[in-house]
């Protein structure tokens, strides 16, 4: 339990940030899921459109320390690679 005024304020700030970060993480996951769904369906055009939305969200999440930057880069790389495989078919 926070005893000092500054600790109580920090607790309130953490609670606010947690809500914002959860929201951003949920949006990011939804964007990635839409890319993965398009890839599973084999729809390259839909996958590219979804990727245009997902990549900035992943990088923004990394920039705001919601996920690690290497994690974001790895996810983007893997999704782009899967979309490229669709083009080869």
From Swiss-Prot:
Keyword Disulfide bond: no
Gene Ontology terms: cellular component: cytosol; small ribosomal subunit
GO BP, sorted A to Z: translation
InterPro entries on file: Ribosomal_bS20 (IPR002583), Ribosomal_bS20_sf (IPR036510)
GO molecular function: small ribosomal subunit rRNA binding; structural constituent of ribosome
One Pfam family here: Ribosomal_S20p
Keywords: Ribonucleoprotein, Ribosomal protein, RNA-binding, rRNA-binding
Source taxon at top rank: Bacteria
SUPFAM superfamilies: Ribosomal protein S20
UniProt keyword Isomerase, yes or no: no
Family under the similarity heading: Belongs to the bacterial ribosomal protein bS20 family.
Record's function text: Binds directly to 16S ribosomal RNA.
Protein known as: Small ribosomal subunit protein bS20
Species the sequence originates in: Bradyrhizobium sp. (strain ORS 278)
Taxonomic lineage from the root: Bacteria, Pseudomonadati, Pseudomonadota, Alphaproteobacteria, Hyphomicrobiales
Gene of this entry: rpsT
């Amino acid at each position: 339990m926070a005893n000092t005024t500054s600790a109580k304020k920090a607790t309130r700030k953490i609670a606010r940030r947690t809500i914002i970060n959860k929201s951003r993480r949920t949006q990011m996951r939804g964007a990635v899921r839409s890319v993965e769904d398009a890839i599973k369906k084999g729809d390259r055009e839909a996958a590219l459109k979804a990727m245009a939305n997902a990549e900035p969200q992943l990088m923004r999440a990394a920039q705001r320390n919601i996920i690690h930057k290497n994690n974001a880069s790895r996810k983007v790389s893997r999704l782009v690679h899967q979309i490229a495989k669709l083009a080869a078919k």
